[in-house]
Amino acid sequence: MTQDNKLQVEAIRRGTVIDHIPAQVGMKLLSLFKLTATDERITIGLNLPSNQQGKKDLIKLENIFLTEEQANQLAIYAPHATVNRIDNYDVVRKQTLSLPERIDGVLTCPNSNCISRSEPVASGFRVQVHGQQVHLQCKYCEKEFEHQAVVQSA
């Protein structure tokens, strides 16, 4: 008797697969980007084995397709993730992520005096890269923060 040690996550016929998400980040992406606001089937793999990362998370969204803009907003949390478009069980498009110019309606400004924290307005940040550092500038208070300060407050 042979034993198959491969972990199997069911394939989807059509939709989006977000792969190579850092371990422990998949649930945060589902929540922040409201990926569960659907009646379609969602398959989540957490702490899956990965040759590149050691462990990774994976999200499969059946019959849901992300725009390039939506996909690139994921890069702030998962810069090395790939977003695969699936049709008839085949990958028809593979997108590597790049940081967008703006991230709107997802993150919270860490400045406790910012109007976005007390008023019903969608948050917005301009993404700036300074060498290897990513900074986010709030569109309301115009303060600039290291990206980690903003993503940890979300």
Curated annotation (Swiss-Prot):
* GO CC, any one term: aspartate carbamoyltransferase complex
User: Which residues are noted in the entry as Zn(2+)-binding?
Assistant: C109, C114, C138, C141
Tell me the Gene Ontology biological-process terms attached to this UniProt entry.
'de novo' pyrimidine nucleobase biosynthetic process; pyrimidine nucleotide biosynthetic process
Which co-factors does it depend on? Zn(2+)
According to the UniProt entry, its GO molecular function terms are: metal ion binding
Keyword tags: Metal-binding, Pyrimidine biosynthesis, Zinc
Record InterPro entries: Asp_carbamoyltransf_reg_N, Asp_carbamoylTrfase_reg, Asp_carbamoyltrfase_reg_C, Asp_carbatrfase_reg_C_sf, Asp_carbatrfase_reg_N_sf
Q: Which Pfam families match?
A: PyrI (PF01948), PyrI_C (PF02748)
Details of cofactor binding: Binds 1 zinc ion per subunit.
Family the entry assigns: Belongs to the PyrI family.
Oligomeric state and partners? Contains catalytic and regulatory chains.
Q: What does this protein do?
A: Involved in allosteric regulation of aspartate carbamoyltransferase.
Q: What is this protein called?
A: Aspartate carbamoyltransferase regulatory chain
Q: What is the source species?
A: Sodalis glossinidius (strain morsitans)
Report the gene name: pyrI
